[in-house]
Amino acid sequence: MISIILVMIGGGFGAITRSAITDYFNHKFTSKLPIATLIVNLVGSFLIGLNIGLSISISWFPAFFVTGFLGGLTTFSTLAKELTLMMTPKFNINLFLNYSLLQFIIGFIACYIGYHI
């Protein structure tokens, strides 16, 4: 029961953080790419790699931080929505492929770097 509460609290903080980052970047920058989603996913990938690399052994930490906070921070569903919305009558294959590659390849690299720090 405690782990469920930790996931809920961590997820709430992660979602609030994602919302704040999204609002900030949407107001500060104009781009054809959804920069905010890219940033939260890259930060989340780096942090999960860091968590794996540090082998944090605090019993409550994975539920709160990994499943909760990082689960609330990162977002695959928003990525899927953004990629779908790119497939409009003005579809730009280069934009679509670049954004996809940035998300997945750079996300993996961020996780790898976090793991090896």
UniProtKB/Swiss-Prot annotation:
This is Fluoride-specific ion channel FluC 2. Belongs to the fluoride channel Fluc/FEX (TC 1.A.43) family. Pfam families: CRCB. It is a multi-pass membrane protein. Keywords: Cell membrane, Ion channel, Ion transport, Membrane, Metal-binding, Sodium, Transmembrane, Transmembrane helix, Transport. Na(+) binds at residues 71, 74. HAMAP family: FluC (MF_00454).
